[in-house]
Amino acid sequence: MRPFIIGIGGSHSKVGKTTVACNILKKFNGWGAIKYTKTSFYSSIIDSPEILQQENKDTSRLINAGAEEVLWVQSPFENLQEVLQIAIDRLSHLKGIVIEGNGAIEVINPDIVFFVSANEDLKRGSEKVLRIADAVMFDRYLPKETPRTATKLHINNEEDYINFIMRRLRIV
């Protein structure tokens, strides 16, 4: 059975995607995480503790937040679906997986899509993920293109997005 998958995308880098992922992982035991980084030429799935636990890396933050397993997927977008499916299969024994990265959200069908935005600006291409977001997490301003159907959550209100997930998991 496929684990419950939460995709976390965002308006641009350094917007808080990893912080949101870490907050989720702190609350849900038995979950793993996949960090996606777009590359130009090669694909890989990194599971080496020496690499994943390097200080100040997003992957080390995910591990420290309590992820049972973390994989770092690196791939050109055109190969991502195949590589990401392999990574998901490797974590299929877990209760859930948090997947970080806009491209990853575009090629899989997460059970929940969170879009993290610090302001109204969007990097090119991120509007695709915004359009399918179940919830938009914002700091000061919602992106202009925020769908009416998306739940609006303040990025600093961790309790609201944990409750959003719990409702989807039918825990509450």
Regions found by a protein language model. Name each.
Residues 44-49, 82-83, 109, 126:
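Short, well-ordered secondary-structure micro-motifs
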Residues 31, 67, 92-97, 110:
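Short, high-confidence coil segments that cap the C-terminus of an alpha-helix
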